[in-house]
């Protein structure tokens, strides 16, 4: 009898405990949902108050050299840079190894840039680990050296890498990292991707990429899944010319899309679109960056990505050898690209988008949606208040 009474009491207490746990989970979910609603409302309010020129400017991330006429790598802030950023209201600046000399210089440059603006911006860098590490490969920065992603096989290590990189990036003032690489390496001849990929297993690539996303964003640094729709099955280098993937849509759904789905499931803030053509999917050689079917139809609609879609650098050979900066900018925006990275000529690209809105070539709703996505992430990461 005593055993029965004890068992009943245990069941009651356990049941109460479970109810409390469920109640706490419900409270946390409710708080998260409320926070998301507030961010949504605030983002809409900010976007509604922006001029069309300010909205268009938010859609560009450029190098600081775009505003500097010395012909030298920018390592210190100048009035020209501040004036240029404010003239175009750009959404972000990307720094490369040439801009990053040592910690204090980097912090001062970033703080000076942010302190000169009406709208706070993304400060971006390519910091994947391995051979693509603008900071990690600079001995003066004194940060942990991260192995190539091809060597990462443990989800705990992947998350740790995200935390490590996110920590030193945020301490320096960066808030956007063009990482992780979510490409599945299905063609070993692909040296452009090579050991930047987690390998040829789509599920493993997805698991590792998702954990790095979580680690980076835990430290307040936006992650970028790249290079959609999947650059691991190409042989040529899109920095030099147009790359082509022979994959069919079924192939991509079964392999290439898997890491992106998993990274999106981990709530990656960004996805980067690649300058590769997929003729068996689109029917022509249009780069994915300029394809509405790929960017809007597949990435945003089929995969349900609600964050920011950024192009790969618009000054790469795949684009500049086939399109002018104005034409490429308009096509990319209409395809669904939210941020244009490093156009060959900022003034031409900016004015092409601006004029495209005014003459109806670009729907106003497309610009509003892009700007809303951008501002929402800036609010989420505390870049905007």
Positions of PLM-derived features:
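Extracellular glycoside hydrolase catalytic/binding regions
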Residues: 245-254
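Catalytic PLP-binding core of fold-type I/II PLP enzymes
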Residues: 296-309, 313
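Positively charged n-region of N-terminal signal peptides that target proteins for export
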Residues: 1-4
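Preference for extracellular/luminal or secreted protein segments
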Residues: 13-87, 301-302, 320-385
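Bacterial N-terminal signal peptides
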Residues: 6-14, 126
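Enzymes and membrane/adaptor proteins characterized by extended Gly/Ser/Thr/Asp/Glu-rich
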Residues: 65-75, 84-205, 227, 232-246, ...
């Amino acid at each position: 009898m005593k055993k029965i009474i004890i068992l009943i009491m245990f069941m009651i207490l356990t049941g109460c405990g479970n109810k409390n746990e469920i109640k706490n989970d419900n409270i946390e979910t409710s708080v998260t949902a409320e926070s998301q609603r507030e961010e949504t409302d605030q983002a809409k309010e900010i976007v509604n108050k922006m001029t069309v020129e300010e909205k268009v400017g938010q859609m560009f991330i450029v190098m600081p050299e775009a505003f500097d006429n010395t012909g030298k790598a920018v390592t210190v802030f100048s009035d020209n840079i501040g004036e240029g950023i404010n003239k175009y209201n750009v959404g972000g600046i990307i720094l490369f190894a040439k801009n990053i000399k040592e910690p204090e210089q980097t912090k001062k440059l970033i703080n000076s840039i942010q302190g000169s603006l009406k709208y706070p911006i993304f400060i971006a860098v390519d910091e994947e680990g391995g051979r693509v590490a603008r900071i990690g490969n600079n001995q003066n920065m004194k940060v942990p050296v991260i192995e190539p992603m091809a060597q990462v096989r443990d989800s705990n290590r992947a998350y740790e890498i995200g935390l490590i990189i996110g920590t030193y990036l945020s301490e320096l003032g960066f808030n956007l990292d063009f990482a992780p690489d979510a490409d599945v390496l299905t063609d070993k001849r692909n040296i452009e991707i090579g050991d930047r990929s987690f390998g040829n297993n789509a599920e493993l690539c997805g698991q590792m990429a998702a954990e790095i996303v979580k680690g980076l964003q835990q430290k307040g640094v936006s992650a970028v899944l790249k290079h959609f729709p999947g650059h691991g099955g190409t042989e040529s280098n899109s920095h030099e010319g147009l790359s082509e993937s022979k994959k069919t849509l079924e192939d991509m759904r079964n392999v290439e899309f898997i890491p992106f789905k998993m990274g999106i499931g981990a709530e990656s803030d960004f996805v980067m679109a690649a300058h590769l053509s997929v003729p068996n999917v689109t029917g022509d050689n249009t780069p994915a960056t300029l394809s509405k079917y790929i960017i809007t139809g597949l990435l945003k609609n089929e995969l349900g990505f609600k964050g920011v879609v950024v192009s790969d650098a618009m000054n790469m050979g795949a684009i500049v050898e086939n399109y002018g900066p104005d034409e490429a900018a308009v096509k990319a925006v209409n395809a669904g690209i939210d941020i244009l990275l490093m156009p060959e000529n900022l003034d031409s690209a900016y004015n092409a988008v601006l004029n495209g809105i005014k003459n109806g070539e670009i729907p106003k709703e497309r610009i509003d949606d892009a700007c809303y996505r951008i501002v929402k992430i800036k609010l989420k990461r505390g870049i905007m208040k």
